[in-house]
Amino acid sequence: MSEGLVRFGVEDGIAVITMDDPEHRNALSLTMRRGLRDALERFNTDPACQVGILTASGSQVFCAGGDLKEMAEHQIGVPERTFVPILNRNLWIDKPIIAAVNGIAFGGGFLLAMMCDLAVAADHARFAMPEAKWSRGAPWSIPLHSMMSQRVWMELALTGDPIDAQRAYEIGFVNRVVTPDVLLSNTMALARRIRDNAPLTVRATRQMIYMAAEMGRTAAWDVADHLFEAVYRSEDALEGPRAFREKRAPQWKGR
């Protein structure tokens, strides 16, 4: 299904959200931002979707960032907190989503890759936070404190210089680097591995990992215990060991 500048499709429980404005390098115009928010909300509320993939059409640009021409035309000063959909900040998603970065991811494109739970990058992809070059800001980059070292983050933010996919992998920003021809298939394979696991455990684990980045160890342990109570009491918690005993694939119900 096509919705403006953002396409949305579902295949075997995996939603693929595709930015599709290559003429404007998938810049985050108002139309693109609205399309992304709508697609992400649809992914979160559709019970048929277990895992999401965020990518872009073409092979050169994932997202070049904010639409600076639009910003200049409308004299955008301080962006509203909801200016760009940011997962776990102004848009709450409880399902895992993977970025399939097919090219340049600058500024807001860097943000989109960062906000996903996992990232797979084509080997020619490049990442940058160029806000310092244009007197903009990157308050959205706060989650990087738990993704990379302070000095790596500092260099990216203060210089605005791009890094290649291999460097992004070395600093822990992306999980895998692959050739462009297998980017989507590799990302789909990763998504299927997650999809096939117990959905309640996947979602609770995802939430636990994010909370651990914000809390002290003891507090995080207590919250994690509470999170997994619902998992342990679920029908799926009985189905897993039963399937293991019967030597068959589990049939998850998500309850």
Task: Identify the residue ranges that each predicted region occupies.
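Conserved CoA-thioester-binding segment of acyl-CoA-metabolizing enzymes
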Residues: M1-T55, S59, S185
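Glycine- (often His-adjacent) and acidic-residue-rich active-site loop
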Residues: L5, A56-W92, K133, M215-G216
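Short, active-site-adjacent cap segments at secondary-structure transitions
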Residues: S59-C63, F106, I209
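Crotonase-fold acyl-CoA enzyme core
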Residues: L91-L200, R233-S234, L238-R242, R248
